[in-house]
């Protein structure tokens, strides 16, 4: 089975324009989270869309699904997210297992709730690549020079940009593989390894690159929100 896991566990309101976490802010005529879920609803191979939200916001998320996506709510599960990204993925996979016991071939397409401009092509590419690889990371080529500084004051390295990519989401892998690899980490490793695909890489797994889009914007600042609103208006 193919599942989607939407990471919506953040509670930050640092934009300073609302008491709502970013994923619940309005973008056009509906919340960012709803825009994101809608993209996954369009992919018929996805059995369930599991949304991991902070425990304080579970009821709010359920209300939004009832209001904006009543025809699809049977395909959507709202569950409690974790304290960080990877524990949220873990909770999402546990919710999938509660819905239907996991098999070794079950795949989860994980995605940031605040990237509402994901395309169906990106979702389908992730699913296709995940059939033949251990994991998939969605990326775009780096367009700016990346500078490394180990002390925050002086440049220590300027890597070859031709070999560099900017990571986005989705990140896709088999549910059981993630649970096994994450479970094998020490507490210290769990603190350091906050990116799911990095866990696969350091464990020697095959992580394929899926082509992202520069328009696959992650809305984290007021400027990002302004750009997103202009993109919605153009559509």
Swiss-Prot record:
Residues where CTP binds: 7-10, 82-88, 113
Positions of the record's site feature: Transition state stabilizer: 14, 22
One Pfam family here: IspD
Reaction it catalyzes: D-ribitol 5-phosphate + CTP + H(+) = CDP-L-ribitol + diphosphate
Nucleotidyltransferase listed as a keyword: yes
EC number assigned by the record: 2.7.7.40
MF (Gene Ontology): 2-C-methyl-D-erythritol 4-phosphate cytidylyltransferase activity; D-ribitol-5-phosphate cytidylyltransferase activity
Pathway: Cell wall biogenesis; poly(ribitol phosphate) teichoic acid biosynthesis
GO biological process: cell wall organization; isoprenoid biosynthetic process; poly(ribitol phosphate) teichoic acid biosynthetic process
Residue(s) at site: Positions ribitol 5-phosphate for the nucleophilic attack: 161, 218
InterPro entries, A to Z: IspD/TarI, IspD/TarI_cytidylyltransf_bact, ISPD_synthase_CS, Nucleotide-diphossugar_trans, TarI
Domain of life assignment: Bacteria
Keywords: Cell wall biogenesis/degradation, Nucleotidyltransferase, Teichoic acid biosynthesis, Transferase
Alphabetized CDD domains for the sequence: CDP-ME_synthetase (cd02516)
PROSITE patterns reported in the protein's UniProt record: ISPD
Role description: Catalyzes the transfer of the cytidylyl group of CTP to D-ribitol 5-phosphate.
Similarity comment text for this entry: Belongs to the IspD/TarI cytidylyltransferase family. TarI subfamily.
Protein name, UniProt field: Ribitol-5-phosphate cytidylyltransferase
Species whose genome carries this gene: Streptococcus pneumoniae (strain ATCC BAA-255 / R6)
Gene (name only): tarI
